[in-house]
A protein has these predicted regions:
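Conserved NTP-binding catalytic cores of kinases and kinase-like/nucleotidyltransferase enzymes
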Residues: 1-91, 220, 349-350
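An alpha-helical support segment within catalytic cores of ATP-dependent transferases
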Residues: 8-19, 145, 166-209, 219-223
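Active-site acidic catalytic loop and adjacent metal/ATP-binding pocket
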Residues: 32-42, 50-51, 87, 191-244
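ATP-binding pocket architecture of kinase catalytic cores
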Residues: 47-147
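A glycine-centered beta->alpha junction motif in the catalytic cores
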Residues: 105-119, 164-174, 301-319
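A cross-family kinase active-site recognition segment
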Residues: 119-178, 204
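Active-site activation/catalytic loop segments of kinase-like enzymes and analogous catalytic loops
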Residues: 243-285, 301-318
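ATP/Mg2+ or Mg2+-diphosphate-binding catalytic cores
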Residues: 305-350
Length: 350
């Protein structure tokens, strides 16, 4: 979506929202990695509101996700996590959304931004992050029993992908026929594994998936460590196994650090620093053996769903082409060799 179209959509959304305050200036804050556009609206009373314009994916799943997000925020009120998730501006008792049939806009509270973690975390910070995310996951697990069931899952997403490359004569847009065979085989193997491990009966909690350092802030106390303060950006929010959060958490924990030029390599899942993260997480919210063994499959799901299936619609075109080509040439062919059993042993779960 280009800037002019996004600004027009945001202006129309603000008019429909019906707030009497006027927008004096719309300051773009987009990361320019995805096709979404994000703006900070400066209002005539000196306050600010965040607006996101998008045409990525399905509006109806977007609407469902934001209903769930709003419910999660309400359920976390009164807990340590009250105010952590940037709120969605409501109208008539529901999260407000503007939709014109082709694109959509949502308005968010401009939450206070605390300190950003450094691009490469110290080992104590990695361990602290493990404890903090574990605490957040526990709160989300408690809230999850009061949320409606989601309409999509890992299984349904992979069935949709497999249907799009269902025969040898059909290729994904932007990928060749041989690439389609790599995707088809990898998605089929994942679906077989989901069935074997009975993932439908695993606990499902609200998860955010994309834990890059630009999406959350922290506050440091007088002693060592920090507390997660605020979180924004919900592009990949879903209700699913907590294990889908861990690939990005391995990236944040990595010695590679948060980089402006990046790939979606699985190597971060097997660094000692991620094991330190897992140990700290496990002390607060114990993991099961099956969950840890699922980590390579969670990584495979990320690549298949967010890079291959949705990548052309979500990422900037030059990034989408590179990420998808890396996926089919390197990451998916090598995914079968990924083995989480050393992590299981290190956590004492063998």
């Amino acid at each position: 979506m280009d800037d002019a179209a996004a600004r027009g959509a945001v202006a129309a959304a603000w008019r429909e929202y019906g707030d009497r305050r006027a927008v004096r200036r719309a300051e773009e804050t987009s990361a320019h990695v995805s096709t979404n556009r994000v703006y900070r609206l400066h209002l005539d009373d000196g306050s600010t509101v965040m607006a996101k314009a998008s045409n990525y994916g399905s509006y109806f799943l977007f609407a469902e996700d934001h209903d769930r997000l709003s419910e999660v925020s309400s359920l976390l009120a009164g807990t340590r996590w009250s105010g952590f998730l940037a709120g969605i501006l409501p109208r008539d008792g529901r999260p407000f959304r503007w939709y014109d049939g082709t694109c959509w806009v949502v308005l968010y509270v401009d939450v206070p931004r605390g300190e950003s973690l450094p691009r490469t975390l110290s080992l104590p910070d990695v361990e602290c992050l493990g404890r903090e995310v574990a605490s957040f996951h526990l709160a989300c697990a408690e809230a999850s029993s009061r949320l409606p069931a989601p309409s999509h899952s890992m299984r349904s997403d992979m069935v949709a992908l497999l249907s799009s490359v269902g025969d040898a004569d059909r290729a994904l847009p932007g990928l060749g026929r041989d690439d389609g065979e790599v995707v088809r085989r990898s998605a089929h193997e994942l679906l077989v594994h989901l069935d074997r491990c009975d993932v439908d009966h695993w606990p499902k909690i609200p998860i955010l998936v994309d834990w890059n350092l630009g999406n959350f802030s922290v506050v440091r106390g007088d002693g060592a460590g920090f507390r997660l303060l605020t979180r924004w950006d919900y592009d990949w929010f879903r209700i699913d196994s907590r294990m889908l959060d861990f690939y990005f958490l391995s990236r944040v924990s990595s010695a590679t650090g948060d980089r402006t030029a990046f790939t979606y390599s699985p190597h971060t899942l097997f660094e000692e620093r991620f094991l330190a993260f897992l140990r700290s997480y496990h002390e607060v919210a114990p993991l099961t053996r099956d969950e840890v063994l699922f980590l390579p499959w969670a990584y495979r799901f990320f690549v298949l769903n967010y890079v291959v299936r949705d990548g052309r619609r979500f990422f900037r075109s030059d990034l989408a082409d590179r990420f998808r080509q890396e996926a089919v040439s390197t990451y998916l062919p090598g995914a079968g060799a990924l083995d989480a059993s050393p992590l299981v042993a290190a956590l004492g779960l063998d």
